[in-house]
């Protein structure tokens, strides 16, 4: 496969945000990743001691945080700025949200411990992987969704409103609203009816 043209006038960050192949260890992206790491550590340190301060740190870290959002540390992100979380959402310990592409989490979502939201993808071509190229696809979690502990949501997936993803499920394809999906790969096992 031919090497992508990285001299199209866009920065690696612009390429990343557009969903195109980019080089992840670009200095601008590396600095943004370090900033996110430091803010997540600051969030952890202030979580129990100073809730108001932890809320301010979360607002600095994430792209958008709705009212009443509660995130138990530790929290792991690539950049933070690509994550929006709707009001009333609860996130248990150990969320991994690799936000190379946008991650949108709706209102009143329940996220169990050690859930992973993984937007990065890597080329199948070994030469491109060796050259450190990667890309990403967005993840969208609808309103009032419950992600069970240890669930993994892969790049490009949308989960519809009111759906439940069972603990340990690996979500590789879109999940419609008002269903229960479990397993690897996640499969719909029950319809919940419209709400």
Where are these regions (language model features)?
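Short hydrophobic beta-strand segments in globular cytosolic domains
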Residues: 148, 154, 166, 171-172
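Terminal amphipathic alpha-helical/low-complexity segments used for targeting or macromolecular assembly
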Residues: 1-68, 186-190, 194-195
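Short, functionally important structural connectors and interaction interfaces within domains
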Residues: 8-9, 13-14, 67, 77, ...
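Short secondary-structure boundary/capping segments
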Residues: 13-14, 61, 107, 131, ...
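Flexible, glycine/small-residue-enriched loop-and-beta-strand segment within the central core
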Residues: 75-86, 90-158, 179, 184-186, ...
